[in-house]
Regions:
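Alpha/beta-hydrolase active-site loop signature
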Residues: 63, 89-93, 162, 179
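Alpha/beta-hydrolase active-site loop
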Residues: 104-123
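Structural recognition of the beta-strand scaffold that forms the well-ordered cores
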Residues: 55-58, 84-87, 130-132, 154-157
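Alpha/beta-hydrolase fold nucleophile elbow
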Residues: 125-135
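Conserved alpha/beta-hydrolase
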Residues: 77-96
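Alpha/beta-hydrolase
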Residues: 143-215
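Gly/Ala-rich beta-loop-alpha elbow adjacent to hydrolase catalytic centers
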Residues: 133-137, 141, 145
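Catalytic-loop region of hydrolases
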Residues: 1-83
Length: 215
């Protein structure tokens, strides 16, 4: 990892799944087409199995905090016993530039970030590569493949909703007809009741998450 010039900091992490695990900070340009505009640090979690093994890159759509857990391992990495590179999305948590100039938060910039990470890590992991993500991470997997079709060997988006706009318009008609009228009414009544009891229920949810070690 120290041989990768983009990495400015490396911290070891505990893992019950991998022989070695680290959180690293990878220097990225705000705009890959105009590097003179400045840089930011992107959090990348590296989980090692072997230099001769394939590598899964998780194209997270938001923050990477849950990937720090000693128990975390992405499904494909477990199935195929691969190394795992987990990339936090720019402008989330510890991958947020200062100042926050939102014009650089684009799908293309995110794909550029992933391309830079893959190019750097292929120097130590030369085997097959799989990209994968869930929900917005699934979108990110698809967009990464769109901008850089040759970076990975396989792309596996677990759910990849592509919205038509800020107001998509497809969700409401679907929700109005899915299931039976009685089932829809029960769900609506439950949701309203939970909102009415938010002040009482939220502390219980938080206590449960703390006791279970959920993040």
């Amino acid at each position: 990892l120290k041989a990768i010039s983009h990495i400015t900091e490396i911290k070891p992490l505990e893992s019950k799944e991998f022989s070695e695990k680290y959180v690293t900070y990878f220097t990225q340009p705000l705009d890959h087409n105009r590097p003179e505009l400045g840089t930011f640090r992107q959090r990348v979690v590296v989980s090692h199995v072997g230099f001769d093994r394939p590598t899964v890159i998780v194209t997270e759509g938001y923050g990477a905090s849950y990937a720090l857990s000693p128990r975390y391992r992405e499904e494909l990495s477990r199935m195929f016993n691969t190394n795992m590179i987990f990339v936090e999305y720019r402008y989330f948590l510890e991958s947020t530039p200062e100042p926050r100039d939102w014009q650089y938060l684009t799908a293309e910039s995110s794909a550029d970030d992933l391309h830079a990470v893959v190019e750097a890590f292929k120097k130590i992991y030369p085997g097959k590569w799989i990209s994968t993500g869930i929900s917005k991470g699934g979108q990110t997997t698809m967009l990464f493949r769109t901008f850089y079709p040759n970076d990975v060997d396989i792309s596996v988006p677990y759910v990849g909703p592509l919205c038509y706009g800020v107001e998509d318009g497809r969700h409401e008609p679907f929700l109005r007809q899915v299931g039976t009228e009685e089932e829809r009414k029960k769900i609506e009544d439950f949701q309203l009741e939970v909102l009415k009891r938010k002040a009482t229920l939220l502390p219980r949810f938080e206590k449960h998450c703390t006791e279970k070690g959920y993040e």
